[in-house]
Amino acid sequence: MPNVEIIVTSDGSHSLRNMEVDDTYHSIHGAVQESVHVFIKNGLMFFENQNHPSEIRILEVGFGTGLNAFLTLKHALGSKLQFHYTSLEVDPITKQTIQQLNYPEFLDFVGGTSLFQKLHAASWSQEDEIVNNFVLKKQLGRLQDIALGDQQFDLVYFDAFGPAKQPELWDVGILKKVEQSMKQGAVLVTYCAKGQFKRDLRSLALRVQTLPGPPGKKEMVRALK
């Protein structure tokens, strides 16, 4: 279990500071604000508007606090889409920390508290139906060690700690593994907009878009296969 402390970000939502990595799980300028901007609006909603799918398969690198999964689940509740959500995590947070996070109160929708707990209580390495159109599969382990398969995913939330803190997860070999797991037409989104990262994505024949970032951050990246 990670050594973390809860922090309050500028929009009032919680994040965690990992004391060993010396980094926060989200932007200090607003955790929910960042996740909505990067992953929901510029990832999920972009993919839906471009493709009008009947189902969507999502890969998340870094389950963390469960915020991205929770926001995606909230979106799914008002959707006819079928969601299959695979999330990788190497160091799950404790039940005590989970219970202190304020996302259910912050987002404040019917059933939110129980659904947030259900996401975290889901078993590892097997599919769990959270609601009838949202199936979660949490995978415990390192991205380097987990088999992703080829052309499995429509959308990737790449939400690892930054390249300065976890350079091994931003290595071009790892990015190639992720790219191979993406279907043709798939989308990858991340808060990171480092030059080397964008060059590596382009070397994998992905079309890289540099977009305005969330408050407090100049840019983010969306990559299209």
Regions found by a protein language model. Give the residues of each.
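Rossmann-like AdoMet
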Residues: 1-56, 74-107
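A short SAM/SAH-binding and catalytic strip from SAM-dependent methyltransferases
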Residues: 154-168
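S-adenosyl-L-methionine
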Residues: 97-149
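Conserved beta-strand signature within the Rossmann-like core of class I S-adenosyl-L-methionine
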Residues: 155-157, 184-192
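Conserved S-adenosyl-L-methionine
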Residues: 62-64, 89
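Core SAM-dependent methyltransferase catalytic element
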Residues: 204-225
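Glycine-rich SAM-binding Motif I of class I
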Residues: 66-70
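A short glycine-rich, Lys/Arg-flanked "PGG" loop and its adjoining helix->strand segment in the class I
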Residues: 168-184
